[in-house]
Amino acid sequence: MEVTCLLLLALIPFHCRGQGVYAPAQAQIVHAGQACVVKEDNISERVYTIRESDTLVLQCLVTGHPRPQVRWTKTAGSASDKFQETSVFNETLRIERIARTQGGRYYCKAENGVGVPAIKSIRVDVQYLDEPVLTVHQTVSDVRGNFYQEKTVFLRCTVSSNPPARFIWKRGSDTLSHSQDNGVDIYEPLYTQGETKVLKLKNLRPQDYASYTCQVSVRNVCGIPDKAITFQLTNTTAPPALKLSVNETLVVNPGENVTVQCLLTGGDPLPQLHWSHGPGPLPLGALAQGGTLSIPSVQARDSGYYNCTATNNVGNPAKKTVNLLVRSLKNATFQITPDMIKESENIQLGQDLKLSCHVDAVPQEKVNYQWFKNGKPARTSKRLLVTRNDPELPAVTSSLELIDLHFSDYGTYLCMASFPGSPVPDLSIEVNISSETVPPTISVPKGRAVVTVREGSPAELQCEVRGKPRPPVLWSRVDKEAALLPSGLALEETPDGKLRLESVSRDMSGTYRCQTARYNGFNVRPREAQVQLTVHFPPEVEPSSQDVRQALGRPVLLRCSLLRGSPQRIASAVWRFKGQLLPPPPVLPAAAVETPDHAELRLDALTRDSSGNYECSVSNDVGSATCLFQVSAKAYSPEFYFDTPNPTRSHKLSKNYSYVLQWTQREPDAVDPVLNYRLSIRQLNQHNAMVKAIPVRRVEKGQLLEYILTDLRVPHSYEIRLTPYTTFGAGDMASRIIHYTEPINLPSLSDNTCHFEDEKICGYTQDLTDNFDWTRQNALTQNPKRSPNTGPPTDISGTPEGYYMFIETSRPRELGDRARLVSPLYNASAKFYCVSFFYHMYGKHIGSLNLLVRSRNKGTLDTHAWSLSGNKGNVWQQAHVPINPSGPFQIIFEGVRGSGYLGDIAIDDVTLKKGECPRRQMDPNKVVVMPGSGAPRLSSLQLWGSMAIFLLALQR
């Protein structure tokens, strides 16, 4: 019955079978890149090892229907400093020149909406070996009461690698081992992870002054070669020592040229010098040459720490730092502090008053303050005190304190900051003290408490400050914790009380606080007010686009909903059909007025004329947004079934193949029933397509439909387009590319022929113990300079696209060289098998073609089953070889090179089947006649008659 079903499947071009083939996604990860090794640590742990800078290729093989969508994600590995995720929506993940930080666990997530998603993972281990670093440390200790000293040297070798490196220490060319003698010790320091090894030379002896090599190895994993570093230890080896040509703190005036020299005072080997600057890089124009640093025309922005570092891998690096200070004065501010003891916030006669002055200076401690009253220097007295460092204010702040304020103390006070003897200009600020000097108040102008603007427009928030003097206004946000102002600052100063915002966005909406500053005015509790900013923006609706399918004659309801907007309401809704304005929907009773958050349109019955694009434009008086509906009775696209087992079926003695195309119909009940499908078949790289109509009966959801594509040419690929048709007309088209793939040549009840058209060559492999390999080629890939008068011009089919396997016997091949092509391993399930194949042996130097059977029952044993030698003419001939393996076996085609270069041998169309070979062998000298060459064929009626008789015999 199984054979009957298979034959019926082949005879009937189309049929429907099965229900509910929808299946959840299944996934499996395989590698296809430059992997060193893939280890299976346990059932759930797979490790993919790859060398750094190689190409990572992972494939997620999926099954399930509909075809699952694949997404790759990654979590951080050991070399990554933080969690990271990358998404790749493709079945193949490819990373060129992979870096160590890209190691980690990769997840393949496959989902198709049926059941739960399938998630598989694999850990990618990136292997690398950096250059080792060797440092030398020396210690000297007193022994036996200072009678003599012991000198101990530590050679520390560090390397970054994965996997952990193996360390080999050498003195000269001799390898050192742990405790080799009393003077040598090798150990791993504490708190290291295998990346460091120390060679300790105790009580240094004359023979210890030598060349030492640290060789690191990862045991050639991934082909990574060993690396080494060498150090020459002498009795003059010493760490670096430095001194500077200037003081550690260097104060200069702006515009001067600065030169600092870093001088070596010791070190063997000769140390390397390096200049750096913090924070940031060296200034533009700065020149570091050896130990000399030059900065022309220095400016205030060039202030900072300049570091000179000397290294020679002996001891610790030597470092000297110069703190460069470029004199500058900026940001002069003052404060008026009423009598703090009496907690007063106003200036009153008879109470104390303090005026403070501060300037941001470099160097801060060198600034000099002077106070003036009404243009004359202020003189200290019992009632007028001047302090340089007020402990209640920022460092180096000068204060002038008036005790028991009198009317005569009113006037204009000026604070001047300077660097005596420096060309830096003085900086001054003045404050007027009078009966009109009052603390500030702040308020929001009338009508400005709420500011409403459209998104993208400028906005201005304003607070008015009254008082004398008027301090700056500081702005901040209130309603959002830790929120920053549009400028990126948490607090922004405005001199006129106006906060100007350019091109506001919706996230700028909220409450803003304005408050008085405690500088350049009264040093009292800040006064504050609030301004509300409202940003209006156009509405956002859903769905922005929706595909609505419905059968003809059924009602349709279209709804456009408001998601967000400011204001959050629908002011108007306008419907259009194919660009034409529709009349407003009928007015509903007051109790059923449509809610303000959506708009609806009802179609009583869908017709061909009412199918098309509908637009709903929703407005909130600020802007509008559109819902787009594509309404039709079109059928959804077919869903190709990709899990068909062995969809490709090749035909013996021809270069045609058939393909089993299977699919389901997506949501068949959503529209009118599918009447037929239109199938378009186009060979890739060609323009013409063949179109067929496939009638069907009522299609159920999940029902698997099938059609066998015949007369496809090996090894071409085809584009398949499938379109469903209903009473409405053509539905959505689905397309896919089908490729010819040869199955692994497993013996079965039916003949299974390998044409070598696929790169996988049916699972055949090249033997690793022979002298050279078989080559797969066709007439299009032949070497134009190949030897004439040998080898076939085409394969057995006579088409230029057809492939075959052959041995090239030109140089450097020699007499007796062997090439072996080994089949997959077969499990013997029958007593007899027959191996059929075509061979081509043409040329005066033809050697031998042998067929061997490799038995793997008890060990490995190769047995000769067939052999042929010499020139057999420029024709393809067929051989049938019976074999009777006793257990699992492989067949081997062995080509042996003859006495010269005119000895190419080819094979094609290898078939392995159960049972005995045909008793009547084909004449080995008879040319095989291919289809289309004029050979007689059975008519279709004769074929049907023979098949019918065969089916009746099977049923009996």
From Swiss-Prot:
It is found in: Cell membrane. This is MAM domain-containing glycosylphosphatidylinositol anchor protein 1. Residues 780-789 have a biased composition (Polar residues). Gene3D superfamilies: 2.60.120.200, Immunoglobulins. It is a lipid-anchor; GPI-anchor. It comes from Mus musculus (Mouse). CDD domains: Ig, MAM. Interacts heterophilically through its MAM domain with proteins in axon-rich regions and through its Ig-like domains with proteins in differentiating muscle. Interacts (through the Ig-like domains) with NLGN2. The keyword Disulfide bond applies. Keywords: Cell membrane, Developmental protein, Differentiation, Disulfide bond, Glycoprotein, GPI-anchor, Immunoglobulin domain, Lipoprotein, Membrane, Neurogenesis, Repeat, Signal. Residues 627-744 form the Fibronectin type-III domain. The gene is Mdga1. Residues 780-799 are annotated as: Disordered. Required for radial migration of cortical neurons in the superficial layer of the neocortex. Plays a role in the formation or maintenance of inhibitory synapses. May function by inhibiting the activity of NLGN2. Disulfide bonds join C60-C108, C157-C214, C262-C308, C357-C415, C463-C514, C560-C616. Its main location: membrane. Expressed by neurons in layers 2 and 3 of the cortex during their migration and settling in the cortical plate. Also found in layers 4 and 6a. From 9.5 dpc-13.5 dpc, detected in the marginal zone of the developing cortex. At 16.5 dpc, modest expression is found in the intermediate zone. At postnatal day 1, evident in the superficial cortical plate. By postnatal day 7, expression is limited to layers 2 and 3 throughout most of the cortex. Residues 24-123, 132-230, 240-323, 338-432, 440-532, 539-650 form the Ig-like domain. Glycans are attached at N42, N235, N247, N257, N307, N432. Residues 752-919 form the MAM domain. The keyword S-adenosyl-L-methionine does not apply. It comes from the Eukaryota. Disruption phenotype: Mice display impaired migration of superficial layer cortical neurons with neurons found deep in the cortical plate or beneath it. Residues 1-18 form the signal peptide. GO terms for cellular component: axon; cell surface; dendrite; GABA-ergic synapse; Golgi apparatus; membrane raft; plasma membrane; side of membrane. Pfam families: I-set, Ig_3, MAM. InterPro entries: Cell_Adh-Cytoskel_Orgn, ConA-like_dom_sf, FN3_dom, FN3_sf, Ig-like_dom, Ig-like_dom_sf, Ig-like_fold, Ig_I-set.
